[in-house]
Amino acid sequence: MVSPVPRVLATEVALELIRTLQSDYGPVMFHQSGGCCDGSSPMCYPAGDFLLGDSDVRMGVIGGAAFHMSQSQFAYWKHTQLIIDVVPGRGGMFSLENGRDVRFLTRSRLFTDAEIEILEPVLVGAA
């Protein structure tokens, strides 16, 4: 049996930062910002601090942290795999990496036709 293709992945440096944040804050979660105040950065919060709504989509889990975005944003990104990375800079004002001189960054690539057939399912709603 073929393994499902994940919709979201993290680089090793991103996984290391996630582990550090989990050590400092306990369980964490991500929500892909829609582009208002913090651009379109993945925002990291203590698990449960960001209130998910009925229209949020859980894309997957990276480093033990659930990764969400709005359903309307998912409509644009559903054909892409998100790759969460870390780059130098300032994190989003409310994101847990803020003040560490690094920030999470979302990179993406289009799925192949073959991959689209075996994607991991998403969960819709405050899951």
Place the predicted regions along the sequence by residue.
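Domain-level signature for proteins that mediate thiol-based redox and metal-cofactor handling
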Residues: M1-A127
